[in-house]
Amino acid sequence: MSDIIARGNVENGDKLFKARCAQCHTTANGAPNKQGPNLYGLFFPKSRSFPGYAYSDPNKNTGKFCIMWGEQTLFDYLENPKKYIPKTKMAFAGFKSEQDRADVVAYLEQSTK
């Protein structure tokens, strides 16, 4: 178990996800994409690999933006998505609190399996 997952609070992550992320993302197997992709199976696919979702050009490019999602990359991304991937379609400004990010990552690690 990573340090991020260990310090994350899944219940608070669920609340944060529902309040800040669920309007654009789903997490259940087979759920449709919304404004953002369904995050089921999130950890360790390349960032452009969710079927049926039209990714922004920076997400589709090879090299730097071909991200392997894990606890640390997601934790870093959620601080400021537009800084992490310039020109991403994701409108969310990010979670500035490290604890909030750890909580959401812990929730997603559990809910997207």
UniProtKB/Swiss-Prot annotation:
InterPro entries from the UniProt entry: Cyt_c-like_dom (IPR009056), Cyt_c-like_dom_sf (IPR036909), Cyt_c_1A/1B (IPR002327)
Family: Belongs to the cytochrome c family.
Positions bound to heme c: C21, C24, H25, M90
PANTHER family documented for this protein: CYTOCHROME C
Subcellular localization(s) per the UniProt record: Mitochondrion intermembrane space
GO CC, alphabetical: mitochondrial intermembrane space
Signal peptide segment: none
GO molecular function list: electron transfer activity; heme binding; metal ion binding
Record protein name field: Cytochrome c
DNA damage among keywords: no
Task of the protein: Electron carrier protein. The oxidized form of the cytochrome c heme group can accept an electron from the heme group of the cytochrome c1 subunit of cytochrome reductase. Cytochrome c then transfers this electron to the cytochrome oxidase complex, the final protein carrier in the mitochondrial electron-transport chain.
Main location as per UniProt: mitochondrion
PTM comment, free text: Binds 1 heme c group covalently per subunit.
